[in-house]
Structure formats: structure tokens, C-alpha cells
Amino acid sequence: MGGFEKFIIEECRQLKLMGYHLIVCFSVKPICQDYINDLKSIGGECRVIPFKSHFQHYLAMRKLIKQYHTIAIHTNFSSCGFSAILAAISCRVKYRIATQHCLPSLNTFKSRIIYNMENLICTKYLCVSQASTDAMCNGLWWGKRKVVTEYLGVEDFFYDKREMISKYALPVDKIKIANVAYHNPIKGVDVLLKAVDILVHKKQIVNFQIVQIGGGQNPEQTDALHQLETQLHISNYIRWIGVIDTVPELLSACDIYCQPSRSEGISLSIMEASLANIPTIGTRVGGIVESVRDGATGILIDKENTQQLADAMEYLINSKSLRIQMGKVAGNHARQKFQLRSNVTNLLHHYGINM
């Protein structure tokens, strides 16, 4: 179960405490059955509404909304969010919220039309980072006051490092560098592999292992990364974990976190790495610059810059004291800024609900 799913579960829990009922709608059934079970166990409800057309989706959402005394509708990650919001308007739903999780691109006239129309019919447009908010407002022609930043959050945790190293059979005598990402090129896993090539073959640094957590939504993307790994002759330095539900455990076993994304709204994995008290090397894109304080909780680098990434990894590999120092600051920073319960409570204010 990912960080966002845990955020929704906490939202459901808080709503139930206030006497409200959360219905989570999907266009396809979620892969993680634990997520569905956890939602149901705390009074939530899951509905699968396949998307066939905007008109069909509008009718389906309108029918669902009219079955309940619906006070708010909130769309996430949804290409069909526009029709859902229109259905809410037709049923006079008071609070209509959309959340932008990625760094929006409003470089074309068409994209500006789409975002402006969506913002027009919402009562609030939430962005998960200030960088996303700024990008959105720069492309809007009206309604900029509706756009606000609401950070996501992660639940605090603690796992014994030695126990986690043993549990996942990680090398005791090597620095473990974690990366949590799908294998989409936007996440920059290929950049990480090329930086490993520099570390091993140019800098002669070999006392480390990359722990890559995630998978390919498209198998061809994963195959391309494995081919690159073979071409660079770095297979001995990469451990491919795949998609798992126990990311915090693995992060607790590692020493450094690396997020070389080409674009990013904000990274829940960086928040979790910080709670594991390890420093992050991240690119200066989107919300990463808000979750990593350069020189304090980690190191920021330019995107696509494999040399900077290799240099930053070398710097932290060679300094245990700095890793520990940055990790402690990172943990405190995450607990203050990205606390799950308080950030969910902030979200509920946009539904007209005050805890």
C-alpha cells in the first residue's frame, strides 16, 4: 500500500469520527486488496465506475451523488474529473475540489483551456506543492485565489535498522542507497544507473548497493532499464526489489535516499525516507525543493546531471557523520511539515468540516 492510499485511509478515519461517510470511486479496481479492506473496515466504501465517455461518466456520477446527501466531491489522478465535477454542480454539491498531484504543464493553449475550465467549476483547486501552485497560477486567466497548496503527509514509523537489513538480506558491509519509483522515464531511474556507472568505473567506488523499489507500469520501461544496467556492467551494484507494501521497512535499512526525477509534484517517498532518518539526494524540480533542504536534510542537484548525482552520492558515501547529521534534521523536518493527521485535517477544511 502506497503513501497516497494511506492518506486516503486517514481521511476516511477522520471523516468517520465526524459522522461522515467516504465513498472512493475508481475507474479500475485497485490492485491492492489490503487498501480496499482497510477502507471498508473503517466505514469507507469503494465503487468502481469504468470510464467509457465523459457523458457516460457524468451520468454515473450524477446517479451516485443523488443517492446520498453529498456535501463534497474531490477528484484525484483523474482524467474524468471534469465530468465528475459537472455532475456535482448539477446536483448542487457545495464543495467541489480537484487536486493536482503532478507539476502541471500549461505551455500550450489547449492545456491552458483545460486547466482554466476545470478551475472555473471547482470551489478549490489544491496543489501538493508550492511549485505546482506557482506553475498552475502562471497559466490561469482567472480564479487564481482558488488555487492553494495543501501538502500530503505520511505516518511516522520506526524500524530497527539491523533487523530490516537482515529481513531483506541486504549487505551489512555496504552503503545502501534507496530509490522508490515507477520505471517511467519521468522518474529518472536511468539517470541513477548512469551515475552508478560513473561511481564504479570512473571513481572506483564500489562499497555501495542501489536498492530500487518499484516497477514498470509498462513492461517495456522496466526492460529498457535492465538493458541499460547490462550495457553499463553495473548489475552487481543494483538490487531490484519490485513493488512492495513495506517501503518504510526497506528505507529504514538504507543509508541514503536518491530521487533523480525529471519532474515531480511532490514525493511521498522523500517524506518517508526523511522519517527513516536518512538524507536525500534529489533534483531541483517541482516539490522536491520543498521536501529537501539543500545542505541540511540532503543535497539538491540539477536534473539529468549524472555527474552531479555521482558526486553527491560519493560525498555521502564517504561521510557517515554527515549522513547521520542530515538524517536527523530530515526526520525533524518531515515530522513538522508532512505530518499525516494534521495535513488530512487541513484537507477536510475544504469540505467545510472542522475537526
Please give the residue ranges for each predicted region:
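Short hydrophobic beta-strand element within catalytic cores of glycosyltransferases
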Residues: 279-282, 292
